Swiss-Prot record:
UniProt similarity note: Belongs to the GHMP kinase family. Homoserine kinase subfamily.
Gene that specifies this protein: thrB
Signal peptide range: none
Main localisation: cytoplasm
Record-level Gene Ontology MF annotations: ATP binding; homoserine kinase activity
GO cellular component terms attached to this protein's record: cytoplasm
One GO term of the biological process aspect: threonine biosynthetic process
EC class name: transferase
Name the record gives this protein: Homoserine kinase
Function in brief: Catalyzes the ATP-dependent phosphorylation of L-homoserine to L-homoserine phosphate.
Length: 324
């Protein structure tokens, strides 16, 4: 059996639409093994239990199947156990975690059974992006840290990873808002086909500032660097109270605030006490008519990990540069 942990992620971080992402220290654990019986059995505990056990709808299995096909390996029956801590369809990278977890677990299982090298980090990332359609969540889910990524038509996904500034934490507040239909498609559907040059320059300024601020540990710049005009103003109608929640977070001491991915969750970055920020954001959502709950977590410096035993972790991917 192999065990893999994979982190939640938050994409965009305000201005970096489909480009920026960060890994969060909230993890799903996936166990995978051959059973000797010609069948696929999926067990899910936590978020998604009762809805994700069908192999045809399970992203972990669908991703794993692609690895087996790529490596020419036919498992002798398959058991997948998922302990799901990442909320589903809340803007915290649940689909990216499932995809990356399935790829990494299947790769590790084939390595264990055959003794072969399996797929390297770059191959796994290319597969993850091909499944997900964009790199902003799957890159930090696989690699950890703060990531900048883009797609090149010739070279595929290109990325850089940065360690998150020390002491920075995330408060994620999840309103009880249901976005009709498929969440990501609905959230993209409200975006305009064109934006003004003024707004495009505004976002370029802040995306560049945000990357530099993270790289240099200038958390004092996050308030401005996480501002956006490209997607959040248009998605506000899908998240009642969003602007008030942003204002409440900043007034309570957050360093910066943004929609988490396509929403409806909102992420605030904090350096000191997280509780006042979480309470203020929850209250703002409640004032707007939505109950909400919050999670406070560290930013994850590591991405998907193969767990080699109780309490021990083994990185079976090529590691990014040492971050200290």
């Amino acid at each position: 059996m192999v065990r893999v942990s994979v982190p939640a992620t938050s994409a965009n971080l305000g201005p970096g639409f489909d480009t920026l992402g960060v890994a969060l220290e909230l993890r799903n654990v996936i166990e995978m093994d051959e059973t000797g019986i010609d069948d696929v059995v999926i067990e899910v505990e936590g978020a998604g239990a009762g809805a994700l056990e069908d192999p045809g709808r399970n992203m972990v299995y669908q991703a794993a199947r692609l690895v087996f096909q790529r490596l020419g390996y036919e498992p002798n029956g398959l058991l997948i156990r998922e302990k799901v801590a990442i909320p589903v369809a809340r803007g915290m990278g649940s689909s990216a975690a499932a995809i990356v977890g399935g790829l990494v677990a299947a790769n590790a299982l084939v390595q264990k059974r055959t003794g072969g090298p399996g797929l390297d980090r770059e191959e796994l990332l290319r597969m993850a992006v091909a499944i997900e359609g964009h790199p902003d969540n799957v890159t930090p889910a696989l690699l950890g840290g703060f990531t900048v990524s883009c797609m090149d038509p010739d070279r595929g996904p290109l990325y850089l990873c940065f360690p998150p500034p020390r002491g920075l934490r995330a408060v994620v507040v999840m309103p009880e808002v249901q976005i009709k239909g498929r969440k990501t498609e609905q959230s993209r559907g409200v975006l305009p086909a064109q934006v003004s040059l003024r707004d495009a320059v505004y976002n370029l300024n802040r995306t560049a500032l945000l990357v530099a601020a993270v790289a240099q540990g200038r958390t004092d710049l996050l308030r401005v660097a996480m501002q956006d005009r490209l997607h959040q103003p248009y998605r506000a109608a899908l998240v009642p109270g969003m602007r008030s929640v942003f204002e409440a977070a900043l007034s309570a001491g957050a360093l910066g605030v943004a929609l988490s991915g396509a929403g409806p969750s909102v992420i605030a970055l904090v350096a000191e006490s997280a509780e006042p920020v979480a309470l203020a954001m929850e209250a703002a959502f409640q004032w707007a008519g939505s109950n909400a709950r919050s999670l406070t977590m560290d930013l994850a410096r590591e991405g998907a990990r193969v767990l080699s035993g109780p309490g021990r972790e083994q990185d079976m991917l090529d590691r990014p540069p040492h971050w200290g």
